[in-house]
Amino acid sequence: MFCNLSPMIDFDALKSEKGLILAVVQDQLSREVLMCAYMNREALEKTVETGITHFWSRSRQQLWKKGETSGHVQKVKEIRVDCDMDSLLLLVEQVGGACHMGYRSCFYRNLEGEVVGEKVFEPDEVYKS
């Protein structure tokens, strides 16, 4: 376990929708928002157990470890729950980029589509078939 979370909030006490809760991932030092994803009970438990973020893929209907393919893992430093108990904030140390498009953050574009984020890797080189 990455830190002492006991007593951990019971997942059933969280206000999940269809067993999923939104997780906002933020860089622990810079406070940059890196990504948002969903967690189910298993993903949260695995994250707490390993100290590496795990999420539930709604499209693939399976658990996934962030960085499993790319090596760009997120080392969890702290987990917070919001006042309504319907979302989580994960403060992490990001290794490499968080975005599968090659950027440090998934929020690399503004509303007009202009790239405003830092590209940190080439996806074609990382996600070779």
From Swiss-Prot:
Mg(2+) binds at D82, D84, D86. GO terms for molecular function: magnesium ion binding; phosphoribosyl-AMP cyclohydrolase activity; zinc ion binding. Transmembrane segments: none annotated. GO terms for biological process: L-histidine biosynthetic process. Zn(2+) binds at C83, C99, C106. It comes from the Archaea. Its EC number is 3.5.4.19. It is found in: Cytoplasm. The keyword Amino-acid biosynthesis applies. Binds 1 Mg(2+) ion per subunit. Its cofactor is Mg(2+); Zn(2+). InterPro entries: PRA-CH, PRib_AMP_CycHydrolase_dom, PRib_AMP_CycHydrolase_sf. GO terms for cellular component: cytoplasm. The keyword Electron transport does not apply. It catalyses: 1-(5-phospho-beta-D-ribosyl)-5'-AMP + H2O = 1-(5-phospho-beta-D-ribosyl)-5-[(5-phospho-beta-D-ribosylamino)methylideneamino]imidazole-4-carboxamide. SUPFAM superfamilies: HisI-like (SSF141734). Pathway: Amino-acid biosynthesis; L-histidine biosynthesis; L-histidine from 5-phospho-alpha-D-ribose 1-diphosphate: step 3/9. Keywords: Amino-acid biosynthesis, Cytoplasm, Histidine biosynthesis, Hydrolase, Magnesium, Metal-binding, Zinc. Its main location: cytoplasm. Belongs to the PRA-CH family. Catalyzes the hydrolysis of the adenine ring of phosphoribosyl-AMP. Homodimer. This is Phosphoribosyl-AMP cyclohydrolase. It comes from Methanosarcina barkeri (strain Fusaro / DSM 804). The gene is hisI.
